[in-house]
Structure formats: structure tokens, C-alpha cells
């Protein structure tokens, strides 16, 4: 099972490496997402993922830019997006404009098991605050995942993330603006969002062999979302990153 997850992660990383080459001037968020979905299918993605607890299968992930990154959604994901009437989640036809962030959170469903990875891109240069918050997301990964090991409380990981965010004065932007998600990670496997949930009310602890996604993200009005998400394996002694793709913000106009 673990080797299938590792193989899926390798395909996931390879797909993300092609994203700058898929961008064209004048695209909307949906245009770019369609090109990414095509590339994922070419590499063996099954094209859908299953969601825990909601008896549903939906398309391959979301792409958020500009104010749509802060749009609330009825679905229990880290960020929402207006989407469409058929599925109020994710891209909604927003033009990709200069100075906006492009957050890509597409599921690595290349077989039976899922991997989950988010990376942030830009159309030209972003504000200094956007780069600061993106670096803060990376710092949260470094600090919090150092504490992750068998027996670690999921609530402690969430609360440690909040502590770092509050010390940086970034609370109003963390995990949304109008509607802020009350978790910072989740398990995954056959479904994209399984137990445990990294949230303040969780009673769960990490156990060897668990696969978790960790996704501290920030939303800036008019700019979009920044931050990353990685999939981690809980080992006997700590944590292993299964999605070690480049983590910096990549300017799509400089491809």
C-alpha cells in the first residue's frame, strides 16, 4: 500500500512540474485547471476522488485566484471558492490577472490511494505581505512537523500552528477570511479527507503508518491564497514528506 502511495506521489510531483508550461496569457482559472487535469489524466490519474463522510465523488481538486480564494463553500475543505451552481467549490471562471496568486490544490489520485499537495504560483510579482505569509506557511511546516511523531496529539499540532500564526500577527488571514477553516490537516488514503483531523477538538494521536496532509494556508483579499500542502507519512520515529516538490512561489509569467 505504501509503495502505491509513493508511486502516486511521484506522478503528482511530475504533473506539478509541468504547470508553468501549461499557462497562457489571457487564461481564466478554469482554463488553467482544465489543462492541469488533462496532464494529470495523461499521467494516469483516475480523474475523481472520493470524500469521507459525504458519500460523494468529485473532480480532481481546486484552483483559486484573487477574491475567489476567500469565497465560502458549503464543503468541508480548507478553502472554498465559488465554483458553479452544480458544485459550489473551486474555480469559477475568474481571469488570471497581474499581481494575483494562483493556488493549485489538485488531488494525486493515480491509483487506489490519494496524495494531496498544494503549491502557489503567481501572475507577475505579488505584494510583500503575500510572500511573507507564504514563508510563514513554510515555517509552520518546519516547526510543527518536527513535533509530529507516533503518539503526538493532533490537537497539539493544530494549536502549535495557531500559536505561530498569532505570534506573526497573521490570524485574520489564516485558513480563509470570511469563513475560516477550523483545522489545518487531515488523514488521507482511499478517500481524500479521512481521519484523523488536525483540529483543536481532536482526541486522536498520530500512529505509525498514518498518512496525513498538512495545509497551513493564508488568504489575502484581492490577491488570493498562499501557502503549501504536503502529504506526510508517520514513521516509527517521526515524519516523512512524500511530496517534496519545490515550495517557493513560482511566477507563471517567467516560464
PLM regions with names:
Residues 1-255:
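Active-site neighborhoods and metal-handling regions in enzymes and metal-associated proteins
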Amino acid at each position: 500500500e505504501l509503495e502505491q502511495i509513493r508511486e502516486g506521489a511521484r506522478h503528482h510531483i511530475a504533473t506539478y512540474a509541468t504547470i508553468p508550461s501549461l499557462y497562457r496569457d489571457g487564461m481564466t482559472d478554469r482554463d488553467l485547471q482544465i489543462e492541469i487535469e488533462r496532464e494529470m489524466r495523461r499521467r494516469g490519474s483516475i480523474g475523481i476522488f472520493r470524500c469521507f463522510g459525504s458519500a460523494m465523488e468529485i473532480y480532481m481538486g481546486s484552483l483559486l485566484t484573487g477574491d475567489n480564494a476567500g469565497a465560502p463553500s458549503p464543503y468541508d475543505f480548507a478553502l472554498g471558492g465559488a465554483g458553479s451552481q452544480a458544485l459550489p467549490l473551486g474555480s469559477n471562471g475568474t481571469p488570471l490577472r497581474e499581481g494575483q496568486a494562483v493556488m493549485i490544490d489538485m488531488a494525486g489520485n493515480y491509483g487506489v490511494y490519494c496524495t494531496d499537495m498544494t503549491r502557489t504560483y503567481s501572475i507577475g510579482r505579488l505584494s510583500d505581505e503575500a510572500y511573507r505569509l507564504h514563508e510563514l506557511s513554510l515555517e509552520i511546516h518546519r516547526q510543527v512537523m518536527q513535533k509530529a511523531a507516533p503518539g503526538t496529539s493532533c490537537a497539539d499540532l493544530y494549536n502549535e500552528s495557531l500559536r505561530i500564526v498569532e505570534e506573526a500577527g497573521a490570524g485574520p488571514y489564516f485558513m480563509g477570511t470570511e469563513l475560516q477553516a477550523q483545522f489545518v490537516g487531515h488523514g488521507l488514503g482511499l478517500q481524500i479527507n479521512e481521519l484523523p483531523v488536525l483540529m483543536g477538538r481532536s482526541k486522536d494521536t498520530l500512529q505509525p503508518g498514518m498518512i496525513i496532509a498538512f495545509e497551513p494556508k493564508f488568504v489575502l483579499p484581492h490577491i488570493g491564497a498562499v501557502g503549501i500542502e504536503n502529504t506526510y507519512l508517520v514513521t516509527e520515529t517521526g515524519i516523512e514528506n512524500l511530496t517534496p516538490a519545490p515550495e517557493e512561489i513560482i511566477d507563471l509569467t517567467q516560464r
